[in-house]
């Protein structure tokens, strides 16, 4: 991977100076030795799983050093470089990627702290401020991550990504969003598992799913019931295959009662994970909706509920650990 990085650099960078492989940081060797020692302590050296784990670690470090080599040669040639995310990039990686081609010296290169983790597939690309990389839009990425953070009540997502605990919060929310939407802004299509699921889906539910999709939530309708015996006994399932139950707040005068009933019914469904309320057709304020959802979610011990407000904005209310009422759970409130 390191030699390939040099070859690639010389091929695609015009008038590039002679490239060289970047020095291996001392902490890399130490980290590898510690990893091997930890593996050997847990099993025999000839165990295939142990050898596979060691091989995977070596492959990962080789890939990462390819990135270090690209950075090293970019600086030697007076170029900038950017960190281009792919796959399941974490919030911290996305924060680095959203800066674009800003790194151009050993000082600025130190800003990313050499951050790499297991299964990180971010790629370092050398270039300049005007360079365009297919599928890489740092400004768009920053906008979407700002939107994602705002749905959690976080004002500055880049600062949050540098905070250990808030990074975990962002990463959990990233797991709920479609990766193509996160990385390149492509809105996922609303889909149906089969013809029956499409037939059973109500028009207002499909419209609600379309609104969710605009915020990067992948919506696939499933048949919302399951036969459990020969007598034809049915049990309910969530509207969407990812465990989301769709509920509307339209035409309700008693907000608390509607939410209470909706969460009660939703939680009983097999595979239920969260509930989304559509408030686009209501006159309730975000604060009123938040308070009602928070109150009922605590009582029902449901740790994730979301809603779409009158303006089409998406809000997530997370009650960490779904603690019992009166235990002051951590709540992320909408603005």
What are these regions (language model features)?
Residues 92-94, 121-123, 243-245:
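Structured core elements
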Residues 86, 96, 125, 247, ...:
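Structured loops at beta-to-helix junctions and adjacent beta-edge loops in soluble globular domains
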Residues 1-117, 127-181:
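Domain-core detector
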Residues 178-227, 249-335:
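Metal-dependent nuclease catalytic core centered on acidic motifs
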Residues 240-250:
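Conserved catalytic cores of phosphodiester-cleaving nucleases, focusing on short active-site segments
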Residues 115-127, 315, 319:
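C-terminal edge-of-domain segments
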Residues 84-86, 227-232:
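A short beta-turn/loop motif at secondary-structure boundaries
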Residues 233-238:
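A short, glycine/Asx- and small/polar-enriched loop/turn
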């Amino acid at each position: 991977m390191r030699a390939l990085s040099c070859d690639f650099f010389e091929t695609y960078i015009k008038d590039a100076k002679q490239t060289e492989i970047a020095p291996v940081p001392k902490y890399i060797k130490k980290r590898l030795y510690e990893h091997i020692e930890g593996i050997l302590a847990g099993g025999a050296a000839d165990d295939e799983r142990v050898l596979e784990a060691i091989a995977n670690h070596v492959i990962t470090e080789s890939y990462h050093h390819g990135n270090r080599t690209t950075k090293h040669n970019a600086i030697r040639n007076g170029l900038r470089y950017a960190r281009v995310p792919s796959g399941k990039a974490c919030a911290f990686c996305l924060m680095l990627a959203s800066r674009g081609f800003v790194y151009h010296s050993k000082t600025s290169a130190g800003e990313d702290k050499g951050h790499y983790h297991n299964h990180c597939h971010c790629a370092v690309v050398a270039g300049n401020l005007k360079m365009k990389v297919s599928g890489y839009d740092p400004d768009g990425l920053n906008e979407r991550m700002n939107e994602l953070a705002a749905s959690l009540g976080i004002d500055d997502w880049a600062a949050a990504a540098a905070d250990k605990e808030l990074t975990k919060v962002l990463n959990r929310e990233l797991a709920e969003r479609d990766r193509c939407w996160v990385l390149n802004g492509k809105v996922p299509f609303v889909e149906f598992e089969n013809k029956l699921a499409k037939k059973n889906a109500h028009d207002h539910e499909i419209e609600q799913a379309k609104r969710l999709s605009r915020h990067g939530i992948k919506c696939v309708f499933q048949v919302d019931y399951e036969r459990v015996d020969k007598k034809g006994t049915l049990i309910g399932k969530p509207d969407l295959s990812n465990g989301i139950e769709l509920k509307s707040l339209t035409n309700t005068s008693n907000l608390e009662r509607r939410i209470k009933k909706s969460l009660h019914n939703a939680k009983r469904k097999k595979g239920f994970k969260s509930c989304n309320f559509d408030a686009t057709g209501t006159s309730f304020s975000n604060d009123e909706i938040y308070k009602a959802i928070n109150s009922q979610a605590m009582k029902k011990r449901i740790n994730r509920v979301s809603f779409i407000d009158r303006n089409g904005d998406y809000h997530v209310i997370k009650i960490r650990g779904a603690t019992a009422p009166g235990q002051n759970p951590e709540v992320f409130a909408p603005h």
